[in-house]
Structure formats: C-alpha cells, structure tokens
C-alpha cells in the first residue's frame, strides 16, 4: 500500500465530511429565515453530501486495508461500491427537489429575507470551490474512484450554488417563480450527475478494461522490449488504486527457461516503472505454439 495514496485519499474524504457538516448547519439557519425553496434544495443536497461523504470516508478506510486470506486481490472494489452508493443518495435528493420545485412552481411564495440566503450561498460557493480544487489535485495524484465520485458531486454543488444566487436575486426583484424553476433545473443536473456516476461505478465493478491510452502504453512497452517476438491476450482492470495487467509473451522456441524468466521479469519491471503498484502477471509462450491468428492479437 502506497502511504502517500492512503494519506491523500483519507485527507480528501475527511475534508469533504467536515465541510458538509458545517454547510448543513449554516443552510438550515438560512432556509429557516428565508423560506427559499432553492435554499431548501441546497439544504437537502448538503444533507445528502454529509451522508455520502460519511459513507465515502468509512468505505475509503476499508478499501485501504491490505489484501488478506479472504480478499487476496485487496479491498479496492469498496471504492466502486462507495461511488455507487453516492449515486443512489444523489438520485434520491434529485427526486425530492422535483417534487418540491413543482409544488412551489404551482404556488409560489415570497421570500422573507433573500439577503441572508445570498450571504450563505456565497460562503457555500467559495468553500466548495476550495474543496473541489483540493479533490481534483488528490484525484490527479491517486486516481481514486471514490474521491473522483465525491469531486463530481461537489462540482455539481458549485453549479447549484451559482444557480441559487441567481434565483435569489431574481426573486428579490419580484420573479417569484424563479426560485422554483432553478430548483427544478438543479434537480435535473443532479440526477444526470448521479446516473453518470452510477454508470462509472458499475463499469468498474464489472472489471472494465483500463483506458485505451494506458492499454496502448502497455502494448508499446512490451512490443519494444528486446527479445520479445510478440504478445497476445492482454487483460486489464482496476480495483481501487491497483491496476491488474495480464498478458502472454511470445519468445524464441529454444530460449533457455532461465533466460525466458529473466526476460519476463524485465518486462514486468518496465510495466511497474510506468504503473507503480500494478499487479502484473506474464505467461511465456514459445512462438511456435501460438496460432498465427493469435500472434500480436491483443484482444481476447
């Protein structure tokens, strides 16, 4: 386990949980004093943020545990489960916003004190921007799916807070239905983000192959290595921070076993240099036993 990976992923999860807790308290106060349905939408979203971030925090801590006898490939899939759980939380909040928005659209109510709502929303907007910037940096360093899902969630919050500012300003100037209309628009965007997040999580749980650019890098490293005649049957997937890479190397028929072993280890080390922490499994094939149609055939 890379200690840097564990430290930054935990820091990002803790930061999100702390911010969600603070914003929830502030937004309850603001909604109570304004009656804004857009602020109610923000309040519900912060409640969902807190539940999702707490789930994320516990799951991330679990996923960082090393492999054991019962989980020989580690616990990385827990990150995908966290992302899937977040998508469910977010979908539920979007449906609630639709119901509330339609009700206030049919019967708009004047806001009591929009200035409080505007001030609170500005605080939420800038603090969430800081969190998203930190999360994006962590994702670039770790490629954590759980933190990436959380980041996408809070990115939608940034847009939502911007929309709420506009809605509150319009309501202040007499556009009474603007509040409800923006709440509905926010609900649509949140639902879209949730569905996209859920799709990515399911694809990871189904062991989707690594991205095309990473697969091409693997192919380039293997085929350019001296002594390798060819390769085939590349299999890749990702679980948490760990990439899994499996392939067959094609070698000269009469190459001594020890030489073949050393060559395979050299290729493995080259792949590990490019993809630190990867789990690489290489099978050596004499080139004469590989059918012509399988030679250099990377797909299964």
UniProtKB/Swiss-Prot annotation:
Domain of life: Bacteria
Residues spanning the membrane: 12-32, 40-60, 82-102, 114-134, 155-175, 178-198
Catalytic reactions of this protein: Zn(2+)(in) + H(+)(out) = Zn(2+)(out) + H(+)(in); Cd(2+)(in) + H(+)(out) = Cd(2+)(out) + H(+)(in); Fe(2+)(in) + H(+)(out) = Fe(2+)(out) + H(+)(in)
Gene Ontology annotations for the cellular component aspect, listed alphabetically: plasma membrane
Keyword Acyltransferase: no
Keyword Transport set for record: yes
Binding of Zn(2+), residues: 45, 49, 153, 157
One Gene Ontology molecular-function label: metal ion binding
S-S bonds: none
Annotated membrane topology: Multi-pass membrane protein
Keywords: Cell inner membrane, Cell membrane, Ion transport, Iron, Iron transport, Membrane, Metal-binding, Transmembrane, Transmembrane helix, Transport, Zinc, Zinc transport
A GO biological process held by the record: intracellular zinc ion homeostasis
Subcellular locations according to the entry: Cell inner membrane
Role summary: Divalent metal cation transporter which exports Zn(2+), Cd(2+) and possibly Fe(2+). May be involved in zinc and iron detoxification by efflux.
Family: Belongs to the cation diffusion facilitator (CDF) transporter (TC 2.A.4) family. FieF subfamily.
Subunit structure: Homodimer.
The protein's name in its UniProt record: Cation-efflux pump FieF
Protein species of origin: Yersinia pestis
Upper classification of the organism: Bacteria, Pseudomonadati, Pseudomonadota, Gammaproteobacteria, Enterobacterales
């Amino acid at each position: 386990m890379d200690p840097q990976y564990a430290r930054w992923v935990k820091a990002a999860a803790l930061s999100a949980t702390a911010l969600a807790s603070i914003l929830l308290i502030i937004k309850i106060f603001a909604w109570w004093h304004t009656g804004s349905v857009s602020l109610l939408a923000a309040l519900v979203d912060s409640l969902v943020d807190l539940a999702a971030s707490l789930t994320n925090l516990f799951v991330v801590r679990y996923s960082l545990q090393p492999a054991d006898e019962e989980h020989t490939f580690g616990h990385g899939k827990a990150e995908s489960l966290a992302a899937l759980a977040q998508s469910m939380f977010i979908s539920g909040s979007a449906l609630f916003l639709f119901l509330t928005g339609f009700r206030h659209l049919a019967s708009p109510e004047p806001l009591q004190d929009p200035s409080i709502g505007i001030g609170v929303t500005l605080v939420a907007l800038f603090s969430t921007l800081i969190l998203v910037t930190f999360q994006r940096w962590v994702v670039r360093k770790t490629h954590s799916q759980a933190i990436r899902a959380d980041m996408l969630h809070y990115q939608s919050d940034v847009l939502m807070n911007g929309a709420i500012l506009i809605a509150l300003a319009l309501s202040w100037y007499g556009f009474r239905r603007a509040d409800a209309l923006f709440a509905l628009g926010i609900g649509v965007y949140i639902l879209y983000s949730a569905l996209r997040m859920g799709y990515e999580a399911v694809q990871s749980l189904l062991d989707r192959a690594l991205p095309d650019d990473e697969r091409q890098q693997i192919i380039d490293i293997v085929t350019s290595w001296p002594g390798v005649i060819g390769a085939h049957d590349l299999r890749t997937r990702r679980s948490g921070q760990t990439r899994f890479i499996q392939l067959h190397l094609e070698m000269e028929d009469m190459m001594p076993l020890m030489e073949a072993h050393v060559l395979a280890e050299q290729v493995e080390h080259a792949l590990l240099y490019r993809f630190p922490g990867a789990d690489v499994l290489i099978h050596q094939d004499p080139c004469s036993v590989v059918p012509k149609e399988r030679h250099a055939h990377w797909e299964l």
